[in-house]
Amino acid sequence: MTEALLSRAMNDALDPPLLPLPDRVAALLSELGSPPRLAAHLRAVHDVAHQLVEWVEQHSPAVVFDREAVLFGAATHDVGKTVHLDELSGPGSAHEEAGQALLIGHGISPELARFAATHASWMDARVGLDDLLVSLADKIWKNKRVPDLEDLVVARLARATGRAAWEEFLALDGILARIGDAADERLAFQASFPIHV
């Protein structure tokens, strides 16, 4: 039953549609015995990240970022919650470093594993646009607006495009509002899967 629920959370056709998790991530979550709710969360955030990277590519084609890294990071950012189950239903950050170590231990490069540790650390001067996009996807999937995070994304976009920060803010605000409009459906999807089976 657990494997069937996990498979549904990662791959089933849905209304509204969510992209399935990448095969590499789905295989890892199956191997780890991921709680179905975690897989559902990762799928929702991955789908939102996909919308964000498509928007950046269309809105600002000159902006340099690693599309595949952002998508992988969004799909695995909370993988450490497979060992810190209490953080699926309550606050905590132990899953961040644990997730990075878990991914590296399963052969994932440190460059990709870092998102598990950086997705809540957007104020760190070492994070790049890729990290910020993963962090943003992890917030906006549930329509949570974080002005400090959004300001950092706006600044990176304005610097890369040469457009005024207010122009970048208006454009980003528009896409975040559109993505946020479907938050209730994504939250309901996640909540439809159990933590413990």
Predicted features by range, described:
Residues 2-94, 145:
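Acidic/His-rich, divalent-metal-binding segments that scaffold phosphate/diphosphate chemistry
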